[in-house]
């Protein structure tokens, strides 16, 4: 009996979550943001992370190149 109630509760929760997601999708598509296609401005932290990625890739390249 408890297992059936638990299963019904899970089904109801999943159904409500799907309906809520569909509602938000429809609501957001009716009022699109004017800056949807613009990339976010590059911040100082983003530049730092991008530089770290470049350094990491170049060091990996040098490691592979030296091991061959």
Swiss-Prot record:
Its main location: virion. It is found in: Virion membrane. InterPro entries: Chordopox_A13L. Residues 22-68 are virion surface. The keyword Membrane applies. The chain crosses the membrane at residues 1-21. Signal peptide: none annotated. One of its GO terms (cellular component) is membrane. It is a single-pass membrane protein. It holds the Pfam family Chordopox_A13L. Phosphorylated by a OPG054-independent mechanism. Induction: Expressed in the late phase of the viral replicative cycle. The keyword Transmembrane applies. Keywords: Late protein, Membrane, Transmembrane, Transmembrane helix, Virion. Belongs to the orthopoxvirus OPG139 family. Essential for the encapsidation of DNA into immature virions (IV) and the subsequent maturation of IV into mature virions (MV). This is Virion membrane protein OPG139. It comes from Variola virus (isolate Human/India/Ind3/1967). The gene is OPG139.
